[in-house]
């Protein structure tokens, strides 16, 4: 099985909240797709609650598009990580990390402005696979954590696992 890019960085040294370019690739037509690691929590030390991350998934996707799309950037998808420490965001374009960080903070401010759980988009059995598993309060606690702590940039060259360590881990 091929080694995925996300497993070549040292999770014990990742800062959070932080933006990291996880991968860039070119499509056959020459467009650049960039995948960002939006790390909300420090790996293996913190985790987002399942109801909060689920609600955030519904809110974050729209709010990030409001603040980031345009000027050569179009978000394809924003999905929570299975480890519940962040989200992956795939987009067309190559925005600077600071632009992404600023959009992320603006999106978190928007989450704090949502006044009622009934205002969560697609919160029904027809559009959500687990529509009863939501918490606006938890999503807002996550958003407040981001705004209180700020967003830094994680750099792959600073987090790269040495080849010796990858061999030691049998990868």
UniProtKB/Swiss-Prot annotation:
Top-level EC class as recorded in UniProt: lyase
EC annotation from Swiss-Prot or TrEMBL: 4.4.1.21
Cofactor, how bound (note): Binds 1 Fe cation per subunit.
Reaction(s) the record says it catalyses: S-(5-deoxy-D-ribos-5-yl)-L-homocysteine = (S)-4,5-dihydroxypentane-2,3-dione + L-homocysteine
GO process terms (BP): quorum sensing
Keywords from the named record: Autoinducer synthesis, Iron, Lyase, Metal-binding, Quorum sensing
List of residues binding Fe cation: 54, 58, 128
Record's keyword annotation contains Ribosomal protein: no
Cofactor: Fe cation
Gene Ontology MF annotations: iron ion binding; S-ribosylhomocysteine lyase activity
Stored Pfam families: LuxS
Function: Involved in the synthesis of autoinducer 2 (AI-2) which is secreted by bacteria and is used to communicate both the cell density and the metabolic potential of the environment. The regulation of gene expression in response to changes in cell density is called quorum sensing. Catalyzes the transformation of S-ribosylhomocysteine (RHC) to homocysteine (HC) and 4,5-dihydroxy-2,3-pentadione (DPD).
Alphabetized PANTHER family for the sequence: S-RIBOSYLHOMOCYSTEINE LYASE (PTHR35799:SF1)
Family statement drawn from the similarity comment of this UniProt entry: Belongs to the LuxS family.
Subunit organization: Homodimer.
Name the UniProt record assigns to this protein: S-ribosylhomocysteine lyase
Gene name as annotated: luxS
